[in-house]
Amino acid sequence: MADTLRYPFAAVPGPGAVVSVAPGVLWVRMPLPMVLDHINLWLLEDGDGWTIVDTGLKSSRIQGHWEQVFAAHLGGKPVKRVIATHMHPDHIGQAGWLCGHWNCELWITRTDWLFARMLSLEALPEPPRDAVEFYRRVGFPVDALDFFRNSGYGNFAKGVTPIPIGHQDRKSTRLNSSHT
């Protein structure tokens, strides 16, 4: 057994660039401002257009990277849909902007869509008392509780563009006769 990881590609895509991993499948990599410093996203050729899988965090910098990708790699074809695999901000953060930019639908499970919509609308100066009490009961140390109390509540909204009001529920959809 090898003691190092082997990667199938010698290079990773830089900001605004892609790597073709299979016919009609482009790997896009967007930066994240944390220890895990990137997210892998995908462009799938979809007949007369493209499907985006996951979107990156809300930021004008990432929107600029997407604009570079659109200009250089879509071959003049539109984006037909955006699929968010789940509701974390790095996966759905640019969904509102992308769907508005391309006038296309967001595809996501109903539960993740509802949760993302709820979290994006709930920004408060401090967390609700029951949220603080929950973390106290599960054993958060006092300093962590103080940090939680004083950090504001609703940071999810800072990492996402407005979540589209409409969506296509992924559980019942198919792409190219295959389940999503």
Residue map of PLM features:
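Glycine-rich, flexible loop/turn motifs
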Residues: 5, 14-17, 159-161
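Conserved beta-strand hairpin/beta-sheet module of binuclear metal-dependent hydrolase folds
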Residues: 15-77, 104
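Active-site HxH/HxHxD metal-binding segment of metal-dependent hydrolases
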Residues: 61, 67-172
